[in-house]
């Protein structure tokens, strides 16, 4: 297991050429690794240990454990408000008195590791799509100018090739930028969709899960119900039917301990907060991209902020002659190139872009 977890760090390696945004990487890399780690830990706990222990009189324990694991267990919701030790044996565990409608069934626990793995794949999908679309364009354009260690002749040759490319392909990068911003929007759609998925998976209990956990400590001892125990009960009931010696159907109640829910409750309270934070960050990012797209006047400001060595007059001149896609290419070049070389490229580009014939070398 340690080897498997150690292999996940490869996804978090620093990229020498950055083609995306930090929030984009939080979604695609960190969240993917987080979900895969949780899935591996829960899988190891579930299939290496014993995820359920049922107590029943007069029947072999192993078949009962298997039956209750693959079917479902239940609690009585009204029993969570009763006093443990005097009114009920455990939170949520009480006599059902034959009232099937009052039972709350738990069927999720055997699927948690698979759902987490599926969520990890969903989080990685936008990165896979973007890597396929990007195709190494920025790496090709930079040509090692991110390190600034090349000889003067080599540097001049690479700068000239880069400027010629930018002039030749001016106003042809809009789809490049729009496809990347689409992938960022896809991240937001994915996170919101996964919140709904988890809420459905936990029978409508996930949306308010984190808020109830926070409010739990502020409630009075007599009135509060631990939301983690309610959603992830440690002790539940299971009913097993079998034929007796005379052929009559016998009903056997068993008390089932679910040690795996100790891991599940901690996993999902962290995921609740992380997904809310990530959804907020992605929402701000999508609005920010919309402003860049709709308000051209902010582009030279951002381009100047990327490299303070480039005068505002130069960024204004460039942004007047280019589209949003060209601006995005220049902005990303500024994130990756040596600042001195980048300043020289922008200055030379601004001079040539003002010449009408420069667009058709």
UniProtKB/Swiss-Prot annotation:
Pfam families reported for this sequence: Innexin
Tissues expressing this chain: Expressed in embryonic neural precursors including the dorsal median neuroblast, glial cells, neuropilar glial ring, developing myoblasts cells and in a circumferential band of epithelial cells at the trochanter/coxa boundary stripe in the developing limb.
Cytoplasmic topology ranges: 1-28, 131-181, 289-361
Superkingdom of origin organism: Eukaryota
GO cellular component: gap junction; plasma membrane
One function term, GO molecular function aspect: gap junction channel activity
Main location: membrane
Sorted UniProt keywords: Cell junction, Cell membrane, Gap junction, Ion channel, Ion transport, Membrane, Transmembrane, Transmembrane helix, Transport
Extracellular topological domain residue ranges: 50-109, 203-267
Topology class, membrane: Multi-pass membrane protein
Transmembrane region(s): 29-49, 110-130, 182-202, 268-288
GO terms for biological process, alphabetical: monoatomic ion transmembrane transport
Locations listed in the record: Cell membrane; Cell junction, Gap junction
Function according to Swiss-Prot or TrEMBL: Structural components of the gap junctions.
Family: Belongs to the pannexin family.
PANTHER family hit by this protein: INNEXIN, INNEXIN INX1
Name used for this protein in its record: Innexin inx1
Organism expressing this protein natively: Schistocerca americana
């Amino acid at each position: 297991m340690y080897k498997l977890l150690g292999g996940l760090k490869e996804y978090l390696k620093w990229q020498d050429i950055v083609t995306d945004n930090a929030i984009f990487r939080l979604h695609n890399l960190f969240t993917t690794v987080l979900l895969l780690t949780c899935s591996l830990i829960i899988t190891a706990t579930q299939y290496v240990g014993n995820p359920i222990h049922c107590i029943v009189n007069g029947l072999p324990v192993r078949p009962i454990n298997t039956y209750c694991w693959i079917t479902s267990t239940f609690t009585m919701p009204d029993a969570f408000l009763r006093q443990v030790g005097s009114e009920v044996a455990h939170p949520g565990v009480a006599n059902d008195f034959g009232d099937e409608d009052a039972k709350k069934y738990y069927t999720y626990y055997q699927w948690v590791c698979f759902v987490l793995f599926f969520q990890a794949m969903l989080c990685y999908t936008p990165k896979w799509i973007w890597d396929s679309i990007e195709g190494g364009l920025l790496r090709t354009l930079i040509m090692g100018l991110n390190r600034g260690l090349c000889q003067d002749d080599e540097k001049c040759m690479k700068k000239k090739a880069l400027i010629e490319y930018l002039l030749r392909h001016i106003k042809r990068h809009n789809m490049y930028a729009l496809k990347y911003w689409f992938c960022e929007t896809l991240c937001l759609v994915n996170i919101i969709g996964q919140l709904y998925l988890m809420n459905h998976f936990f029978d409508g209990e996930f949306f308010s899960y984190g808020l109830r956990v926070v409010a739990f400590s502020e409630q009075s001892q007599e009135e509060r119900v631990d939301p983690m125990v309610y959603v992830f009960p440690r002790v539940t009931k299971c009913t097993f039917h079998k034929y007796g010696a005379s052929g009559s159907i016998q009903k056997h109640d068993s008390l089932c301990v679910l040690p795996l829910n100790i891991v599940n409750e901690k996993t999902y309270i962290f995921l609740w907060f992380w997904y809310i934070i990530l959804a907020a960050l992605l929402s701000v990012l999508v609005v920010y991209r919309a402003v860049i797209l709709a308000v051209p006047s902010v582009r030279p400001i951002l381009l100047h902020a990327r490299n303070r060595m480039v005068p505002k007059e130069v960024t204004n001149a460039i942004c007047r002659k280019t589209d949003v896609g060209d601006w995005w290419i220049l902005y990303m070049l500024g994130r990756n190139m040596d600042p001195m070389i980048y300043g020289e490229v922008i200055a030379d580009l601004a001079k040539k872009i003002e010449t009408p014939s420069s667009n058709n070398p």
